[in-house]
């Protein structure tokens, strides 16, 4: 009887450790996904800022801003990305430009 109880205890401990490992793996996957998407968003922001700086007319400025605004805002709202300070600063600049040129959309 004692041996049976001991085996059951080992099994419970084993299952607990398996669950802890599974949760740890899930957290790592979520963190990696966020980092990946954050990197992609930062790259996209830089790309659009570059496009905006090279733009020759305000119409060409408004179009990438509108596209970027929808994408980034959606990802931020769903907490898929966390913008680092530099990207946040660039994003704020883009949002100001978006407001400035919103009549062209």
What positions do the PLM features span?
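Generic amphipathic alpha-helical segments used as scaffolds and interaction surfaces in large
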Residues: 6, 32, 59, 78-81
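Amphipathic alpha-helical binding modules
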Residues: 66-105
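Generic signature of intrinsically disordered, low-complexity, basic-rich segments
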Residues: 1, 7, 51, 69-70, ...
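Short terminal alpha-helical segments
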Residues: 1-41, 93-105
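Amphipathic alpha-helical interaction modules
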Residues: 22-74
């Amino acid at each position: 009887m004692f041996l049976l109880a001991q085996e059951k205890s080992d099994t419970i401990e084993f299952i607990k450790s398996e669950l802890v490992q599974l949760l740890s793996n899930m957290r790592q996957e979520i963190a990696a996904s966020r980092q990946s998407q954050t990197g992609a968003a930062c790259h996209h922001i830089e790309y659009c800022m570059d496009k905006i700086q090279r733009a020759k007319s305000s119409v060409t400025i408004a179009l990438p801003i509108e596209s970027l605004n929808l994408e980034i805002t959606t990802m931020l709202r769903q907490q898929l990305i966390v913008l680092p300070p530099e990207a946040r600063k660039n994003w704020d600049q883009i949002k100001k430009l978006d407001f400035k040129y919103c009549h062209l959309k």
